[in-house]
Amino acid sequence: MEKKLKSWQGWLLSGGSMVVVFVLGLCVSALMERRAEVASIFNNRKTVIKGIEARNELFKDDFPREYQTWTETAKTDFESEFNGNVAVDALEKRPEMVILWAGYAFSKDYSTPRGHMHAIEDITASLRTGSPAGPHDGPQPSTCWTCKSPDVPRMMEALGVDSFYNNKWAAFGDEIVNPIGCSDCHDPETMNLHISRPALIEAFQRQGKDITKATPQEMRSLVCAQCHVEYYFKGDGKYLTFPWDKGFTVEDMEAYYDEAGFYDYIHKLSRTPILKAQHPDYEIAQMGIHGQRGVSCADCHMPYKSEGGVKFSDHHIQSPLAMIDRTCQTCHRESEETLRNNVYERQRKANEIRNRLEQELAKAHIEAKFAWDKGATEDQMKDVLALIRQAQWRWDFGVASHGGSFHAPQEIQRILSHGLDRAMQARLAVSKVLAKHGYTEDVPMPDISTKAKAQEYIGLDMDAERAAKEKFLKTTVPAWLEKAKANGRLAQK
């Protein structure tokens, strides 16, 4: 016997069905409107761009949301327990680094990084780039510009890649004037993600890989891997090269450099041929759980936002800790405080090893100098220098990566621990050399408790360095900008 619905039940079911259909209709309508708006943006662009366009302001009218959030990379209002977007003098906090970089420009100046909009400003103001008096003067090659501006691909196209690299940094001061922006990651005509720097493409080719076959999700990391990687300047032409031929690990790259007989500088105290790590962010991220699970850089550093019915990537690229509700909590259900402390716990533990390693390594350099002064021979010091080189490479590789102790905490702790082991082995080896020369006491240690004291110990004249840079910023840089404006390299305000 069939059970008939009561009248009110029928009306309720009918009304409920209508509500469901209405809500679904609204969802479909909203989706269609959103797609239509996105399509409208591309089909009715106010500014038609052909070829390479370095002036970020020209994308503002067609992509106002992305442009506005990109300008927020100029902010200096966030500090976590470790880094943020505020420039902090790292040498003042950890003066042992002055000793580790003795004989290299980083011993003069090293601060925590700021946002992309400060890229040109910060490299120009850094003591590391010196105070060149003319286009053929100065300590750095033009290769140093490579990751600082969308003007770089324009200059590479105009001059050729080899010719661009094989110049002085000051040669292009009036050409490279727009900070990291739109065309670095996007094809200016289609706005698709693209690779604008040749070094990444070349690294893939040497590994037998075709970067054009990367998936859209992979591209959300690969555009970052154009710059946030380990690299070196190869040969007299200072050709930017990624040492990935043997693999991504610290040992793989060390083997690559050793085989090539490469070093960045000879240490002023210990005479060690030192490898200076850059910032192997992409490589280390691939070794952590997020990278292994396919999470991209943009997923956490450029989370999606919705505004006016349009979903877009937040171009305020910054630490995910500044927006945990839109980054970590997209996948993890824990509270902001818990998630923040999860990150800090990993960083603190890695930094315990880092701090000890910096202390031991600084002593190893000083003790090696003492051994040379006592008459040690090159043959006697061979093993000492090899151990110092290995220890410092592991230290620098582990600390130069921004966020590495979160991206791959186990790998970073492994690397730093191996570095500490080699630093202590180096000190033991030095003591044996000294014993052969009749010295068995502790090596006297200088006072390097502050940046200023450490810089004085290694012979830097910081007053002269700062005075020269101040003059350079007041005279040369304004002239660069005036010429850039006259040549149309900067957008008119």
Curated annotation (Swiss-Prot):
Heme c 3 binds at residues 116, 224, 227-228. It catalyses: 6 Fe(III)-[cytochrome c] + NH4(+) + 2 H2O = 6 Fe(II)-[cytochrome c] + nitrite + 8 H(+). The keyword Protease does not apply. One of its GO terms (cellular component) is outer membrane-bounded periplasmic space. The gene is nrfA. Pathway: Nitrogen metabolism; nitrate reduction (assimilation). Ca(2+) binds at residues 230-231, 276, 278. Heme c 2 binds at residues 182, 185-186, 315. One of its GO terms (molecular function) is iron ion binding. Heme c 4 binds at residues 297, 300-301, 407. Keywords: Calcium, Electron transport, Heme, Iron, Metal-binding, Oxidoreductase, Periplasm, Signal, Transport. Residues 1-25 form the signal peptide. Heme c 5 binds at residues 290, 328, 331-332. PROSITE patterns: MULTIHEME_CYTC. Substrate binds at residues 231, 279. Its cofactor is Ca(2+); heme c. The keyword Transmembrane does not apply. It is found in: Periplasm. CDD domains: NrfA-like. This protein is not predicted to have a signal sequence by the program SignalP. All other members of this family are periplasmic proteins. Binds 1 Ca(2+) ion per monomer. It is an enzyme of class 1 (oxidoreductase). Belongs to the cytochrome c-552 family. NCBIfam families: PRK11125.1. This is Cytochrome c-552. Pfam families: Cytochrom_C552. InterPro entries: Cyt_c552 (IPR003321), Cyt_c_NO2Rdtase_formate-dep (IPR017570), Multihaem_cyt_sf (IPR036280).
